[in-house]
């Protein structure tokens, strides 16, 4: 499935203003509900719902699957997709964060 096909299967995000990624209660990353960010917002919201707000190696791997073809693009062009870069970093460094949807 393509990214757009996958997005259509994920929970809606009309009620959200942003997603915050927290480390020990401190915000380290943010995804606003803004044009160009809504796909990422939807993916991270789906991860938050499925994994009870936990962003770790397992949920990050699922996130990479959801980002579909954009994942390979992010690997080839670091910094082009910061929300995917975060997932890659979580996996590579075995990090654990909290996803908070607002």
Locations of the language-model features?
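Intrinsically disordered, charged low-complexity linkers and terminal tails
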Residues: 13-15, 41, 46-47, 87
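Short, compact, well-ordered microdomains
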Residues: 61-102
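A structural boundary/capping signal
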Residues: 4-6, 21, 30-31, 35, ...
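Short, charge-rich, low-complexity alpha-helical interaction segments
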Residues: 3-25
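Amphipathic alpha-helical interaction modules
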Residues: 20-58
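Generic structural signal for hydrophobic core residues of well-folded globular domains
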Residues: 10, 47-54, 71, 91-94
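Contiguous interface-forming segments/domains that mediate binding rather than catalysis
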Residues: 5-11, 55, 73, 84
């Amino acid at each position: 499935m393509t990214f757009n096909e996958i997005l259509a299967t994920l929970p809606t995000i009309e009620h959200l203003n942003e997603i915050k990624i927290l480390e020990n209660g401190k915000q380290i990353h943010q995804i606003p509900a803004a044009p160009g960010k809504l796909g990422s917002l939807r993916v991270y919201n789906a991860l938050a719902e499925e994994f009870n707000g936990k962003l770790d190696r397992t949920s990050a791997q699922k996130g990479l699957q959801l980002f579909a073809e954009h994942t390979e693009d992010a690997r080839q062009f670091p910094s082009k997709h910061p929300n995917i870069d975060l997932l890659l970093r979580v996996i590579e460094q075995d990090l654990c964060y909290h996803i908070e949807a607002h």
